[in-house]
Amino acid sequence: MAFDFKKEYKEFYMPKNKPEIVNVPKANYIAVRGKGNPNEEGGAYQQAISVLYAVAYTLKMSYKTDYKIEGFFEYVVPPLEGFWWQDDVESVDYTNKSAFSWISVIRLPDFISKADFDWAVETATKKKKLDCSSAEYLTIDEGLCVQIMHIGSFDNEPATVALMDTYLEQNGYVNDINKDRLHHEIYMSDARKVAPDKWKTVIRHQIKKA
């Protein structure tokens, strides 16, 4: 049975639809940075997703090649995630999607080293005829966070974020969001197959004591 991050780490991927506080350990990711409307057909975001999955599946299937990764075991590619922000605004305008900057990521198993990652980028670029040079090996240490399972369209996120903010205020915490600590989403539904009102998205913000 392949290792499935969603099942082994349910506390990070399947929170309840009410706010909760968690301590998220440091982890490594495949990451691609960009800016612009994520819904733009053939735009930077969709290109970034193609790169992420090309590298992710090259690593996942590496055991069927001559390249051997030390400590490798079979695993399910974890869900797509994203860190989002808008420059020069006091509050996020969810309707102005072209103003978003983002870092799209997919988590890596701990046994995958930077050298393994570099091999996968080179291999995916050659085999899939897709320039994967925009992918980077990124380590993220989120630490103390508030999170919730948002059900529904991304456009309805402000109401869910307001619930999170109220919960923090009631429990003696504040958001700790800045240019290095960003609004974090984990996409638990396939948007191509699930109706928008049923999309499941983990929303996570880093926090600190008030």
Annotate the PLM regions:
Residues 1-210:
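A solvent-exposed interaction/effector surface
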